[in-house]
Amino acid sequence: MKTFTAPEGKLVTVLVDGVEVSYVPGQEYPDNAEFVVTSPMTNQPASFDKRGIEPYRAAVMVNEQGVDEANSVKGAIQGGTVTADGMDGVEIHSTSDDFSAVVSVGGKYTIKNSVLNFDTKSDGKHVCDFSGYGSVLAGFQGAQFTVEKTQINSVGVAKPALFCDDRSECLFKDCNVTVRGGKLYDGYVNSANQKTMVAPPWVLGIGGNARGINLEGDRGTAYVVDTCFKANQWGVLSTDAGQNMHLYVADSDMILLGENVPFSDTKDPYSTKYGSGYGSYIIGNAYEEFSGVDIKVGTHGAVLRGGTAVYKSSKGTIKFVSPITGETVYEAPGKGRITRIDCEFGVMAHGDGKIVFTEGTEVNANNAVFLLKSGGVTCDVEDGAKLNSGNGVILQMMDDDDNLVGAKMTDAGPMFNTEFNEMPGWPSENGQITSKMPAPSFDPMAGGPGGPGGPGGPGGPGGPGGPGGPGGPGGPGGPGGPGGMAMAKPDTFLNATDVTLNGNVYNGTGYYGQKPKPLFVTLGKGAVLNGAVSATETRHIDENGNQNTHFTIKEFYHLAHVENRNFFNGDNTVEVTLKDGAVWNVTAPGIINKLTVGEGCTLNGTVTENADGTLTVAPKA
Protein backbone atom coordinates (compact mmCIF):
# COMPACT_ATOMS: atom_id res chain seq x y z
CA MET A 1 0.00 0.00 0.00
CA LYS A 2 1.13 3.57 -0.60
CA THR A 3 0.10 7.20 -0.21
CA PHE A 4 0.71 10.28 -2.33
CA THR A 5 1.07 13.95 -1.51
CA ALA A 6 -0.18 16.39 -4.14
CA PRO A 7 2.36 19.00 -5.23
CA GLU A 8 1.30 22.48 -4.22
CA GLY A 9 -1.16 24.04 -6.65
CA LYS A 10 -1.62 20.81 -8.62
CA LEU A 11 -4.47 18.35 -9.17
CA VAL A 12 -4.16 14.62 -8.62
CA THR A 13 -6.03 11.82 -10.38
CA VAL A 14 -5.75 8.27 -9.06
CA LEU A 15 -6.01 5.23 -11.33
CA VAL A 16 -6.35 1.68 -10.03
CA ASP A 17 -6.36 -0.99 -12.72
CA GLY A 18 -7.34 1.70 -15.21
CA VAL A 19 -10.32 2.88 -13.16
CA GLU A 20 -10.35 6.49 -11.96
CA VAL A 21 -10.96 6.68 -8.19
CA SER A 22 -11.14 9.51 -5.67
CA TYR A 23 -7.95 11.07 -4.41
CA VAL A 24 -7.91 11.61 -0.65
CA PRO A 25 -4.73 13.06 0.90
CA GLY A 26 -3.18 10.57 3.30
CA GLN A 27 -5.30 7.65 2.12
CA GLU A 28 -3.51 4.41 1.33
CA TYR A 29 -3.86 2.96 -2.17
CA PRO A 30 -2.82 -0.38 -3.68
CA ASP A 31 0.76 -0.68 -4.87
CA ASN A 32 -0.37 -0.65 -8.49
CA ALA A 33 -2.17 2.68 -8.11
CA GLU A 34 -1.04 5.43 -10.49
CA PHE A 35 -1.03 9.08 -9.48
CA VAL A 36 -1.34 11.52 -12.37
CA VAL A 37 -0.54 15.17 -11.65
CA THR A 38 -2.11 17.89 -13.77
CA SER A 39 -2.38 21.66 -13.61
CA PRO A 40 -5.63 23.51 -12.97
CA MET A 41 -6.90 25.99 -15.52
CA THR A 42 -5.73 29.56 -15.13
CA ASN A 43 -9.13 30.99 -16.06
CA GLN A 44 -12.66 29.76 -15.49
CA PRO A 45 -13.93 28.70 -18.94
CA ALA A 46 -17.63 28.67 -18.05
CA SER A 47 -19.95 31.64 -18.45
CA PHE A 48 -21.04 30.93 -14.88
CA ASP A 49 -18.01 31.99 -12.87
CA LYS A 50 -19.41 32.76 -9.44
CA ARG A 51 -17.60 29.76 -7.93
CA GLY A 52 -14.19 30.82 -9.21
CA ILE A 53 -11.95 28.49 -11.21
CA GLU A 54 -13.21 24.93 -10.95
CA PRO A 55 -10.59 22.15 -10.62
CA TYR A 56 -11.56 20.38 -13.84
CA ARG A 57 -9.94 17.00 -14.48
CA ALA A 58 -10.58 14.79 -17.50
CA ALA A 59 -9.31 11.83 -19.45
CA VAL A 60 -8.91 14.21 -22.38
CA MET A 61 -8.51 17.97 -22.10
CA VAL A 62 -9.02 19.79 -25.41
CA ASN A 63 -8.44 23.38 -26.43
CA GLU A 64 -8.35 25.32 -29.70
CA GLN A 65 -4.89 23.93 -30.49
CA GLY A 66 -5.98 20.32 -29.96
CA VAL A 67 -5.46 17.86 -27.12
CA ASP A 68 -3.69 19.22 -24.06
CA GLU A 69 -1.50 16.18 -23.47
CA ALA A 70 0.11 17.50 -20.30
CA ASN A 71 -3.20 17.87 -18.52
CA SER A 72 -5.06 14.86 -19.91
CA VAL A 73 -5.34 11.66 -17.87
CA LYS A 74 -5.24 9.19 -20.74
CA GLY A 75 -4.50 6.31 -18.41
CA ALA A 76 -8.23 6.39 -17.61
CA ILE A 77 -8.97 5.31 -21.19
CA GLN A 78 -9.11 1.56 -21.78
CA GLY A 79 -8.96 -0.13 -25.19
CA GLY A 80 -9.85 1.33 -28.56
CA THR A 81 -7.99 4.08 -30.33
CA VAL A 82 -7.33 7.64 -29.24
CA THR A 83 -6.17 10.33 -31.64
CA ALA A 84 -5.91 14.09 -31.66
CA ASP A 85 -9.40 14.23 -33.16
CA GLY A 86 -11.27 11.76 -31.00
CA MET A 87 -11.66 8.32 -29.47
CA ASP A 88 -13.20 5.16 -30.91
CA GLY A 89 -14.10 1.91 -29.18
CA VAL A 90 -12.83 2.96 -25.76
CA GLU A 91 -14.09 2.55 -22.22
CA ILE A 92 -13.72 5.02 -19.38
CA HIS A 93 -14.65 4.00 -15.86
CA SER A 94 -14.76 6.68 -13.16
CA THR A 95 -15.87 6.63 -9.52
CA SER A 96 -14.87 10.04 -8.13
CA ASP A 97 -17.36 12.89 -7.90
CA ASP A 98 -15.80 15.37 -10.28
CA PHE A 99 -13.89 13.62 -13.07
CA SER A 100 -14.92 14.07 -16.72
CA ALA A 101 -14.37 12.08 -19.88
CA VAL A 102 -13.66 15.11 -22.06
CA VAL A 103 -13.44 18.81 -21.23
CA SER A 104 -13.11 21.03 -24.28
CA VAL A 105 -12.45 24.76 -24.33
CA GLY A 106 -12.95 25.79 -27.93
CA GLY A 107 -11.78 22.48 -29.37
CA LYS A 108 -13.38 19.85 -31.58
CA TYR A 109 -13.65 16.21 -30.50
CA THR A 110 -15.47 13.03 -31.59
CA ILE A 111 -16.43 10.00 -29.49
CA LYS A 112 -17.58 6.81 -31.26
CA ASN A 113 -18.50 3.24 -30.28
CA SER A 114 -17.49 3.83 -26.68
CA VAL A 115 -18.68 3.24 -23.12
CA LEU A 116 -18.41 6.05 -20.58
CA ASN A 117 -19.28 4.67 -17.16
CA PHE A 118 -19.27 7.23 -14.34
CA ASP A 119 -20.56 5.30 -11.34
CA THR A 120 -19.95 7.74 -8.48
CA LYS A 121 -21.25 8.51 -5.03
CA SER A 122 -21.48 12.25 -5.70
CA ASP A 123 -23.75 13.86 -3.12
CA GLY A 124 -23.59 17.33 -4.67
CA LYS A 125 -20.88 18.90 -2.53
CA HIS A 126 -18.10 18.76 -5.10
CA VAL A 127 -19.89 19.27 -8.43
CA CYS A 128 -21.79 22.03 -10.21
CA ASP A 129 -23.90 21.53 -13.31
CA PHE A 130 -24.05 25.30 -13.83
CA SER A 131 -20.32 25.29 -14.61
CA GLY A 132 -20.00 21.79 -16.04
CA TYR A 133 -17.80 20.74 -13.13
CA GLY A 134 -18.28 16.99 -12.85
CA SER A 135 -20.19 16.57 -16.13
CA VAL A 136 -19.22 13.56 -18.23
CA LEU A 137 -18.69 15.86 -21.22
CA ALA A 138 -18.17 19.61 -20.82
CA GLY A 139 -17.80 22.09 -23.66
CA PHE A 140 -16.96 25.78 -23.38
CA GLN A 141 -16.25 28.75 -25.66
CA GLY A 142 -17.15 27.27 -29.03
CA ALA A 143 -16.36 23.63 -28.34
CA GLN A 144 -17.76 21.02 -30.75
CA PHE A 145 -18.60 17.45 -29.79
CA THR A 146 -19.86 14.57 -31.92
CA VAL A 147 -20.95 11.48 -29.99
CA GLU A 148 -21.99 8.40 -31.99
CA LYS A 149 -23.02 4.86 -31.01
CA THR A 150 -21.86 5.47 -27.47
CA GLN A 151 -23.26 4.43 -24.11
CA ILE A 152 -23.07 6.90 -21.24
CA ASN A 153 -23.98 5.92 -17.70
CA SER A 154 -23.73 8.53 -14.95
CA VAL A 155 -24.54 7.94 -11.29
CA GLY A 156 -24.34 10.67 -8.67
CA VAL A 157 -25.92 14.00 -7.80
CA ALA A 158 -25.67 16.68 -10.52
CA LYS A 159 -23.60 14.61 -12.94
CA PRO A 160 -25.03 15.44 -16.40
CA ALA A 161 -23.95 13.55 -19.48
CA LEU A 162 -23.35 16.85 -21.25
CA PHE A 163 -22.76 20.47 -20.34
CA CYS A 164 -22.64 22.86 -23.33
CA ASP A 165 -21.82 26.51 -22.75
CA ASP A 166 -21.22 29.67 -24.80
CA ARG A 167 -21.35 28.81 -28.53
CA SER A 168 -20.55 25.17 -27.86
CA GLU A 169 -22.53 22.40 -29.52
CA CYS A 170 -22.85 18.64 -29.36
CA LEU A 171 -24.46 16.10 -31.70
CA PHE A 172 -25.63 12.77 -30.23
CA LYS A 173 -26.36 10.05 -32.83
CA ASP A 174 -27.54 6.52 -32.02
CA CYS A 175 -26.56 6.70 -28.36
CA ASN A 176 -27.94 5.38 -25.09
CA VAL A 177 -27.58 7.81 -22.19
CA THR A 178 -28.68 7.32 -18.58
CA VAL A 179 -28.17 9.83 -15.76
CA ARG A 180 -29.34 8.35 -12.47
CA GLY A 181 -28.63 10.97 -9.83
CA GLY A 182 -27.84 10.03 -6.25
CA LYS A 183 -28.33 10.89 -2.58
CA LEU A 184 -28.06 14.57 -1.58
CA TYR A 185 -25.67 15.49 1.20
CA ASP A 186 -27.14 16.05 4.65
CA GLY A 187 -28.11 19.65 5.27
CA TYR A 188 -28.69 20.58 1.63
CA VAL A 189 -30.86 23.71 1.46
CA ASN A 190 -33.30 23.94 -1.45
CA SER A 191 -32.77 27.26 -3.22
CA ALA A 192 -32.13 28.90 -6.58
CA ASN A 193 -28.56 29.86 -5.64
CA GLN A 194 -26.64 28.55 -8.63
CA LYS A 195 -23.41 28.27 -6.65
CA THR A 196 -24.89 25.50 -4.54
CA MET A 197 -28.01 24.30 -6.36
CA VAL A 198 -27.84 20.61 -7.26
CA ALA A 199 -31.57 19.87 -7.11
CA PRO A 200 -34.58 21.69 -8.58
CA PRO A 201 -36.40 24.39 -6.62
CA TRP A 202 -39.26 22.59 -4.92
CA VAL A 203 -41.63 25.37 -5.97
CA LEU A 204 -41.61 23.83 -9.45
CA GLY A 205 -43.50 20.90 -7.97
CA ILE A 206 -40.75 18.42 -8.81
CA GLY A 207 -37.97 16.49 -7.10
CA GLY A 208 -34.70 14.76 -7.98
CA ASN A 209 -31.09 15.76 -8.68
CA ALA A 210 -30.26 14.56 -12.19
CA ARG A 211 -30.35 16.40 -15.52
CA GLY A 212 -29.21 14.63 -18.67
CA ILE A 213 -28.09 17.73 -20.57
CA ASN A 214 -27.64 21.32 -19.48
CA LEU A 215 -27.22 24.08 -22.08
CA GLU A 216 -26.09 27.52 -20.96
CA GLY A 217 -24.41 30.75 -22.01
CA ASP A 218 -24.71 32.25 -25.48
CA ARG A 219 -26.32 29.69 -27.80
CA GLY A 220 -25.24 26.54 -26.00
CA THR A 221 -26.68 23.94 -28.39
CA ALA A 222 -27.40 20.21 -28.53
CA TYR A 223 -28.71 17.93 -31.27
CA VAL A 224 -30.09 14.50 -30.34
CA VAL A 225 -30.94 11.91 -33.03
CA ASP A 226 -31.89 8.21 -32.73
CA THR A 227 -30.94 8.31 -29.07
CA CYS A 228 -32.53 7.20 -25.81
CA PHE A 229 -31.96 9.82 -23.11
CA LYS A 230 -32.95 8.88 -19.57
CA ALA A 231 -32.64 10.73 -16.29
CA ASN A 232 -33.99 9.66 -12.94
CA GLN A 233 -35.69 12.76 -11.51
CA TRP A 234 -35.46 16.51 -12.21
CA GLY A 235 -35.09 16.87 -15.97
CA VAL A 236 -34.13 14.94 -19.07
CA LEU A 237 -32.84 17.90 -21.12
CA SER A 238 -32.45 21.46 -19.89
CA THR A 239 -31.52 24.96 -20.90
CA ASP A 240 -30.58 27.26 -18.06
CA ALA A 241 -28.47 30.30 -17.21
CA GLY A 242 -27.93 31.89 -20.60
CA GLN A 243 -29.56 33.31 -23.71
CA ASN A 244 -30.67 31.89 -27.06
CA MET A 245 -29.80 28.27 -26.32
CA HIS A 246 -30.95 25.71 -28.91
CA LEU A 247 -32.10 22.12 -28.47
CA TYR A 248 -33.09 19.82 -31.33
CA VAL A 249 -34.32 16.26 -30.76
CA ALA A 250 -35.47 13.83 -33.47
CA ASP A 251 -36.58 10.19 -33.53
CA SER A 252 -35.52 9.75 -29.92
CA ASP A 253 -36.89 8.87 -26.48
CA MET A 254 -36.76 11.08 -23.39
CA ILE A 255 -37.64 9.32 -20.14
CA LEU A 256 -37.61 10.06 -16.41
CA LEU A 257 -37.07 6.76 -14.61
CA GLY A 258 -38.11 7.47 -11.02
CA GLU A 259 -35.98 4.66 -9.58
CA ASN A 260 -34.58 4.40 -6.03
CA VAL A 261 -36.15 7.71 -5.01
CA PRO A 262 -36.11 9.14 -1.46
CA PHE A 263 -38.81 7.73 0.82
CA SER A 264 -40.78 10.99 0.89
CA ASP A 265 -40.95 10.96 -2.92
CA THR A 266 -42.53 7.51 -2.92
CA LYS A 267 -45.67 9.13 -1.52
CA ASP A 268 -46.13 11.19 -4.69
CA PRO A 269 -49.58 10.09 -5.92
CA TYR A 270 -49.10 11.63 -9.36
CA SER A 271 -45.67 10.47 -10.61
CA THR A 272 -46.44 6.77 -10.31
CA LYS A 273 -45.21 5.57 -13.70
CA TYR A 274 -42.29 7.87 -14.43
CA GLY A 275 -39.93 10.02 -12.40
CA SER A 276 -40.84 13.43 -11.03
CA GLY A 277 -39.59 16.28 -13.20
CA TYR A 278 -39.73 17.62 -16.74
CA GLY A 279 -38.85 16.55 -20.25
CA SER A 280 -37.19 19.86 -21.09
CA TYR A 281 -36.73 23.32 -19.61
CA ILE A 282 -37.13 26.42 -21.78
CA ILE A 283 -35.56 29.67 -20.55
CA GLY A 284 -33.58 32.66 -21.79
CA ASN A 285 -35.26 32.92 -25.21
CA ALA A 286 -34.32 29.31 -25.92
CA TYR A 287 -35.55 27.52 -29.03
CA GLU A 288 -36.40 23.83 -28.70
CA GLU A 289 -37.68 21.51 -31.42
CA PHE A 290 -38.90 17.95 -31.00
CA SER A 291 -39.53 15.83 -34.11
CA GLY A 292 -40.86 12.32 -33.58
CA VAL A 293 -39.92 12.16 -29.90
CA ASP A 294 -41.45 10.06 -27.12
CA ILE A 295 -41.37 12.07 -23.88
CA LYS A 296 -42.32 10.08 -20.78
CA VAL A 297 -42.16 12.01 -17.52
CA GLY A 298 -43.92 12.09 -14.19
CA THR A 299 -44.73 15.81 -14.01
CA HIS A 300 -44.22 18.36 -16.80
CA GLY A 301 -43.67 17.53 -20.45
CA ALA A 302 -41.86 20.86 -20.48
CA VAL A 303 -41.41 23.90 -18.26
CA LEU A 304 -41.59 27.26 -20.03
CA ARG A 305 -39.74 30.21 -18.52
CA GLY A 306 -38.94 32.15 -21.69
CA GLY A 307 -38.60 30.90 -25.25
CA THR A 308 -40.23 28.74 -27.90
CA ALA A 309 -40.80 25.00 -28.21
CA VAL A 310 -42.20 23.19 -31.25
CA TYR A 311 -43.45 19.61 -31.13
CA LYS A 312 -43.93 17.93 -34.51
CA SER A 313 -43.43 14.73 -36.47
CA SER A 314 -40.24 13.42 -38.05
CA LYS A 315 -41.76 13.01 -41.49
CA GLY A 316 -39.65 14.17 -44.40
CA THR A 317 -36.08 15.35 -43.97
CA ILE A 318 -34.63 16.17 -40.58
CA LYS A 319 -32.17 19.02 -40.94
CA PHE A 320 -30.34 20.78 -38.14
CA VAL A 321 -28.57 24.05 -38.88
CA SER A 322 -26.14 25.43 -36.33
CA PRO A 323 -27.29 28.72 -34.78
CA ILE A 324 -23.62 29.43 -34.21
CA THR A 325 -21.95 28.76 -37.58
CA GLY A 326 -24.94 28.59 -39.93
CA GLU A 327 -23.66 25.25 -41.22
CA THR A 328 -25.76 22.10 -41.58
CA VAL A 329 -24.93 19.83 -38.66
CA TYR A 330 -27.22 16.93 -39.57
CA GLU A 331 -29.45 16.08 -42.53
CA ALA A 332 -31.18 12.75 -43.15
CA PRO A 333 -34.65 11.29 -43.72
CA GLY A 334 -36.77 11.13 -40.58
CA LYS A 335 -38.59 8.00 -39.43
CA GLY A 336 -42.05 9.53 -39.72
CA ARG A 337 -42.80 9.27 -36.00
CA ILE A 338 -45.16 11.62 -34.22
CA THR A 339 -44.16 13.30 -30.99
CA ARG A 340 -45.95 11.82 -27.99
CA ILE A 341 -45.87 13.22 -24.46
CA ASP A 342 -47.03 11.22 -21.42
CA CYS A 343 -47.11 13.39 -18.30
CA GLU A 344 -49.10 14.92 -15.43
CA PHE A 345 -49.15 18.38 -17.05
CA GLY A 346 -48.31 18.91 -20.72
CA VAL A 347 -46.49 22.22 -20.38
CA MET A 348 -46.13 24.29 -17.22
CA ALA A 349 -45.40 27.96 -17.88
CA HIS A 350 -44.06 30.33 -15.24
CA GLY A 351 -42.66 32.74 -17.80
CA ASP A 352 -43.63 33.94 -21.25
CA GLY A 353 -43.07 32.24 -24.57
CA LYS A 354 -44.67 30.09 -27.24
CA ILE A 355 -45.64 26.43 -27.47
CA VAL A 356 -46.61 24.76 -30.76
CA PHE A 357 -48.19 21.31 -31.00
CA THR A 358 -48.45 20.29 -34.65
CA GLU A 359 -48.26 17.42 -37.18
CA GLY A 360 -50.23 14.95 -35.09
CA THR A 361 -48.39 15.52 -31.82
CA GLU A 362 -50.17 13.65 -29.03
CA VAL A 363 -50.23 14.82 -25.42
CA ASN A 364 -51.56 12.44 -22.77
CA ALA A 365 -51.79 14.46 -19.57
CA ASN A 366 -53.41 13.29 -16.35
CA ASN A 367 -54.16 16.93 -15.59
CA ALA A 368 -54.17 20.13 -17.67
CA VAL A 369 -52.37 20.06 -21.02
CA PHE A 370 -51.42 23.74 -20.72
CA LEU A 371 -50.76 24.81 -17.12
CA LEU A 372 -50.11 28.54 -17.26
CA LYS A 373 -48.93 30.31 -14.11
CA SER A 374 -47.76 33.32 -16.10
CA GLY A 375 -49.10 35.61 -18.78
CA GLY A 376 -47.50 36.27 -22.14
CA VAL A 377 -47.88 32.70 -23.37
CA THR A 378 -49.07 31.71 -26.85
CA CYS A 379 -50.35 28.16 -27.29
CA ASP A 380 -50.77 27.04 -30.91
CA VAL A 381 -52.50 23.70 -31.53
CA GLU A 382 -52.72 22.69 -35.17
CA ASP A 383 -52.55 20.09 -37.91
CA GLY A 384 -54.17 17.12 -36.19
CA ALA A 385 -52.55 17.44 -32.77
CA LYS A 386 -54.34 15.41 -30.10
CA LEU A 387 -54.62 16.78 -26.57
CA ASN A 388 -55.92 14.24 -24.06
CA SER A 389 -56.54 15.47 -20.51
CA GLY A 390 -57.39 13.10 -17.69
CA ASN A 391 -59.28 15.78 -15.76
CA GLY A 392 -60.85 17.32 -18.84
CA VAL A 393 -58.84 20.56 -18.81
CA ILE A 394 -57.08 21.66 -21.97
CA LEU A 395 -55.82 24.99 -20.62
CA GLN A 396 -55.59 26.07 -16.99
CA MET A 397 -54.55 29.61 -16.12
CA MET A 398 -53.84 30.05 -12.42
CA ASP A 399 -51.90 32.30 -10.08
CA ASP A 400 -48.30 31.29 -9.60
CA ASP A 401 -48.13 29.14 -6.49
CA ASP A 402 -44.31 29.28 -6.62
CA ASN A 403 -44.72 32.88 -5.50
CA LEU A 404 -47.31 31.97 -2.91
CA VAL A 405 -44.72 29.79 -1.19
CA GLY A 406 -42.41 32.80 -1.04
CA ALA A 407 -38.76 33.04 -0.09
CA LYS A 408 -36.43 34.58 2.48
CA MET A 409 -33.56 36.75 1.34
CA THR A 410 -30.19 35.64 2.69
CA ASP A 411 -26.59 36.58 1.98
CA ALA A 412 -26.48 33.60 -0.40
CA GLY A 413 -29.62 34.68 -2.24
CA PRO A 414 -33.27 33.71 -1.88
CA MET A 415 -34.06 30.61 0.13
CA PHE A 416 -37.52 29.21 -0.45
CA ASN A 417 -39.95 28.91 2.38
CA THR A 418 -40.69 25.28 3.11
CA GLU A 419 -44.47 25.38 3.50
CA PHE A 420 -47.49 26.24 1.37
CA ASN A 421 -50.58 27.68 3.03
CA GLU A 422 -53.97 28.56 1.60
CA MET A 423 -57.03 29.91 3.37
CA PRO A 424 -60.00 27.53 3.50
CA GLY A 425 -62.78 28.11 1.00
CA TRP A 426 -62.88 29.92 -2.32
CA PRO A 427 -61.00 33.21 -2.93
CA SER A 428 -64.25 35.09 -3.52
CA GLU A 429 -65.41 34.04 -0.06
CA ASN A 430 -62.26 34.61 2.00
CA GLY A 431 -61.04 37.98 0.76
CA GLN A 432 -58.46 36.75 -1.73
CA ILE A 433 -59.52 38.62 -4.86
CA THR A 434 -56.43 40.66 -5.70
CA SER A 435 -58.26 43.84 -6.75
CA LYS A 436 -60.04 43.92 -3.38
CA MET A 437 -57.01 43.16 -1.23
CA PRO A 438 -55.01 45.88 0.59
CA ALA A 439 -51.44 46.50 -0.46
CA PRO A 440 -48.91 44.48 1.55
CA SER A 441 -47.67 46.16 4.71
CA PHE A 442 -44.84 43.72 5.33
CA ASP A 443 -42.09 41.96 3.45
CA PRO A 444 -44.01 40.22 0.65
CA MET A 445 -41.34 37.55 0.36
CA ALA A 446 -41.90 36.34 3.87
CA GLY A 447 -45.60 35.51 3.72
CA GLY A 448 -48.35 37.18 5.68
CA PRO A 449 -49.88 36.30 9.02
CA GLY A 450 -51.94 33.20 8.55
CA GLY A 451 -49.76 32.05 5.65
CA PRO A 452 -49.70 33.02 2.02
CA GLY A 453 -52.88 34.59 0.92
CA GLY A 454 -53.40 36.63 4.07
CA PRO A 455 -53.66 40.38 3.69
CA GLY A 456 -50.81 41.29 1.41
CA GLY A 457 -49.87 37.66 0.83
CA PRO A 458 -46.80 36.76 -1.16
CA GLY A 459 -46.95 37.59 -4.78
CA GLY A 460 -48.61 40.97 -4.25
CA PRO A 461 -47.30 44.04 -6.03
CA GLY A 462 -43.55 43.91 -5.65
CA GLY A 463 -43.73 40.35 -4.33
CA PRO A 464 -41.80 37.38 -5.64
CA GLY A 465 -42.11 36.98 -9.34
CA GLY A 466 -42.57 40.69 -9.96
CA PRO A 467 -40.14 42.61 -12.12
CA GLY A 468 -36.72 41.17 -11.34
CA GLY A 469 -38.29 38.24 -9.42
CA PRO A 470 -37.28 37.47 -5.87
CA GLY A 471 -33.65 37.80 -5.19
CA GLY A 472 -32.56 39.16 -8.54
CA PRO A 473 -29.85 36.96 -10.02
CA GLY A 474 -30.76 33.35 -9.46
CA GLY A 475 -34.30 34.22 -8.42
CA PRO A 476 -36.71 31.40 -7.84
CA GLY A 477 -37.87 31.20 -11.39
CA GLY A 478 -36.93 27.79 -12.61
CA PRO A 479 -33.89 25.70 -12.05
CA GLY A 480 -31.26 28.33 -11.58
CA GLY A 481 -32.65 30.78 -14.08
CA PRO A 482 -30.27 33.54 -15.10
CA GLY A 483 -31.45 36.01 -12.53
CA GLY A 484 -34.73 37.82 -12.08
CA MET A 485 -36.73 38.28 -15.23
CA ALA A 486 -38.88 41.11 -16.45
CA MET A 487 -42.60 40.80 -15.87
CA ALA A 488 -44.15 38.74 -18.64
CA LYS A 489 -46.72 40.40 -20.86
CA PRO A 490 -50.12 39.54 -19.41
CA ASP A 491 -52.02 38.51 -22.54
CA THR A 492 -52.34 34.78 -23.13
CA PHE A 493 -53.49 33.14 -26.36
CA LEU A 494 -54.89 29.75 -27.30
CA ASN A 495 -55.06 29.33 -31.08
CA ALA A 496 -56.48 26.19 -32.70
CA THR A 497 -56.65 25.18 -36.38
CA ASP A 498 -57.32 21.80 -37.99
CA VAL A 499 -57.79 20.07 -34.63
CA THR A 500 -60.55 18.76 -32.39
CA LEU A 501 -60.14 19.79 -28.76
CA ASN A 502 -62.04 17.85 -26.10
CA GLY A 503 -61.87 19.65 -22.78
CA ASN A 504 -62.29 22.90 -20.93
CA VAL A 505 -60.42 26.20 -20.92
CA TYR A 506 -60.18 28.21 -17.70
CA ASN A 507 -58.80 31.59 -16.65
CA GLY A 508 -58.40 31.38 -12.89
CA THR A 509 -56.03 34.34 -12.36
CA GLY A 510 -56.28 37.47 -10.22
CA TYR A 511 -56.33 36.03 -6.72
CA TYR A 512 -54.01 35.70 -3.71
CA GLY A 513 -52.42 39.10 -4.35
CA GLN A 514 -51.34 38.26 -7.90
CA LYS A 515 -52.18 40.12 -11.07
CA PRO A 516 -54.92 38.84 -13.40
CA LYS A 517 -54.09 37.95 -17.00
CA PRO A 518 -56.43 38.21 -20.01
CA LEU A 519 -57.12 35.12 -22.11
CA PHE A 520 -57.88 35.13 -25.84
CA VAL A 521 -59.19 31.93 -27.43
CA THR A 522 -59.30 31.74 -31.23
CA LEU A 523 -60.79 28.77 -33.06
CA GLY A 524 -59.81 28.88 -36.72
CA LYS A 525 -60.17 26.80 -39.86
CA GLY A 526 -60.90 23.15 -39.18
CA ALA A 527 -61.05 23.67 -35.40
CA VAL A 528 -63.70 22.03 -33.21
CA LEU A 529 -63.93 22.63 -29.45
CA ASN A 530 -66.04 20.26 -27.39
CA GLY A 531 -65.89 21.90 -23.99
CA ALA A 532 -66.47 24.92 -21.79
CA VAL A 533 -64.58 28.21 -21.64
CA SER A 534 -64.80 30.31 -18.50
CA ALA A 535 -63.36 32.78 -16.06
CA THR A 536 -62.92 30.92 -12.78
CA GLU A 537 -61.56 31.00 -9.27
CA THR A 538 -59.20 28.27 -8.10
CA ARG A 539 -58.10 26.52 -4.96
CA HIS A 540 -55.63 23.71 -4.37
CA ILE A 541 -56.81 20.14 -3.97
CA ASP A 542 -55.18 16.85 -3.03
CA GLU A 543 -55.34 13.60 -4.94
CA ASN A 544 -58.77 12.89 -3.44
CA GLY A 545 -60.28 16.18 -4.58
CA ASN A 546 -60.32 17.80 -1.13
CA GLN A 547 -59.06 21.34 -0.62
CA ASN A 548 -55.37 21.29 0.26
CA THR A 549 -54.73 24.24 2.57
CA HIS A 550 -51.29 23.21 3.80
CA PHE A 551 -48.37 21.09 2.67
CA THR A 552 -44.59 21.16 3.03
CA ILE A 553 -41.50 20.89 0.87
CA LYS A 554 -41.65 17.11 1.28
CA GLU A 555 -45.01 17.19 -0.50
CA PHE A 556 -43.81 19.34 -3.39
CA TYR A 557 -45.94 17.33 -5.80
CA HIS A 558 -49.18 18.99 -4.61
CA LEU A 559 -48.23 22.32 -6.21
CA ALA A 560 -50.33 23.27 -9.28
CA HIS A 561 -53.13 20.82 -8.55
CA VAL A 562 -56.25 22.98 -8.40
CA GLU A 563 -59.99 22.88 -8.97
CA ASN A 564 -62.13 25.56 -10.61
CA ARG A 565 -65.43 27.28 -9.99
CA ASN A 566 -66.93 29.66 -12.53
CA PHE A 567 -66.37 33.21 -11.29
CA PHE A 568 -65.50 36.57 -12.83
CA ASN A 569 -63.47 38.70 -10.43
CA GLY A 570 -63.67 41.80 -12.60
CA ASP A 571 -60.28 41.30 -14.22
CA ASN A 572 -59.76 37.69 -15.39
CA THR A 573 -61.22 38.42 -18.80
CA VAL A 574 -61.85 35.83 -21.50
CA GLU A 575 -62.54 36.56 -25.17
CA VAL A 576 -63.52 33.83 -27.64
CA THR A 577 -63.38 34.18 -31.43
CA LEU A 578 -64.65 31.68 -33.99
CA LYS A 579 -63.53 32.20 -37.58
CA ASP A 580 -63.07 30.36 -40.87
CA GLY A 581 -65.81 27.82 -40.20
CA ALA A 582 -64.80 26.84 -36.66
CA VAL A 583 -67.20 24.93 -34.40
CA TRP A 584 -67.75 25.25 -30.64
CA ASN A 585 -69.90 22.60 -29.03
CA VAL A 586 -70.52 23.96 -25.54
CA THR A 587 -70.60 21.17 -22.94
CA ALA A 588 -70.94 23.14 -19.69
CA PRO A 589 -71.77 26.72 -18.65
CA GLY A 590 -68.98 29.29 -18.66
CA ILE A 591 -68.49 33.01 -18.08
CA ILE A 592 -66.71 35.02 -20.78
CA ASN A 593 -66.44 38.70 -21.68
CA LYS A 594 -66.65 38.73 -25.45
CA LEU A 595 -67.78 36.30 -28.13
CA THR A 596 -67.26 36.73 -31.86
CA VAL A 597 -68.81 34.15 -34.17
CA GLY A 598 -67.61 34.64 -37.73
CA GLU A 599 -69.42 33.87 -40.94
CA GLY A 600 -69.78 30.15 -41.57
CA CYS A 601 -68.94 29.26 -37.96
CA THR A 602 -71.10 27.21 -35.60
CA LEU A 603 -71.86 27.82 -31.94
CA ASN A 604 -73.83 24.96 -30.45
CA GLY A 605 -74.79 26.70 -27.25
CA THR A 606 -76.80 29.55 -25.76
CA VAL A 607 -75.55 33.01 -24.83
CA THR A 608 -77.01 35.08 -22.00
CA GLU A 609 -75.87 38.58 -21.08
CA ASN A 610 -75.39 39.11 -17.36
CA ALA A 611 -75.95 42.26 -15.30
CA ASP A 612 -72.19 42.90 -15.01
CA GLY A 613 -71.77 42.79 -18.79
CA THR A 614 -70.30 39.30 -18.90
CA LEU A 615 -71.76 36.53 -21.01
CA THR A 616 -72.81 33.09 -19.86
CA VAL A 617 -72.32 30.54 -22.61
CA ALA A 618 -74.12 27.29 -21.87
CA PRO A 619 -75.11 24.09 -23.68
CA LYS A 620 -78.36 24.08 -25.58
CA ALA A 621 -81.24 22.66 -23.57
Feature roles, as predicted:
Residues 2, 9, 21-27, 32-33, ...:
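Short terminal (N- or C-terminal) low-complexity/amphipathic segments
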Residues 6, 15-16, 23, 29-31, ...:
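All-beta strand scaffolds that present successive hydrophobic residues in beta-strands
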Residues 94, 118, 154-156, 179, ...:
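Residues in short coils/turns that link rungs of repeat/solenoid architectures in beta-rich domains
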Residues 389, 491-492, 501-503, 510, ...:
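Extracellular beta-solenoid/beta-roll
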Residues 41-69, 117-141, 166, 177-218, ...:
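Acidic/polar low-complexity surface segments
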Residues 230-250:
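Extended alpha-helical scaffolding regions
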Residues 70-74, 96, 147, 182, ...:
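Low-complexity, glycine- and small/polar-enriched segments
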Residues 89-179:
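Post-signal peptide N-terminal segment of secreted/secretory-pathway proteins
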